[in-house]
């Protein structure tokens, strides 16, 4: 499903003043990665390859499901090794601030 997760991320997006970042989620079993760009109050999200990424994250669909269902944070997924990431870790930590799925 090409729309998986997109509406959920949109619904939970909390704009961050003066914050810009580009994320690429490689979700196991999906042909295309999930690209997410935050530009202050604007969120761009779609499936497809993009350049100039700040944080690459790799995870299984079950882990992404746990995150968007509010059972786990991005930070916890990373700390437990259920999500691997490379790039700017300060930008990685912002994910839980911008997308509070746990409330």
Labelled PLM ranges:
Residues 1-103:
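Feature captures hydrophobic
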């Amino acid at each position: 499903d090409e729309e998986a997760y997109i509406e959920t991320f949109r619904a939970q997006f909390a704009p961050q003043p003066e914050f810009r970042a580009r994320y690429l989620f490689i979700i196991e079993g999906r042909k295309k990665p999930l690209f997410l760009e935050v530009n202050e109050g604007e969120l761009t999200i779609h499936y497809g390859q993009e350049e100039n990424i700040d944080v690459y994250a790799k995870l299984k669909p079950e882990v992404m499901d746990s995150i968007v269902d509010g059972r786990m944070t991005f930070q916890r997924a990373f700390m437990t090794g259920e999500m691997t990431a490379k790039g700017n870790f300060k930008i990685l930590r912002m994910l839980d601030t911008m997308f509070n799925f746990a409330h």
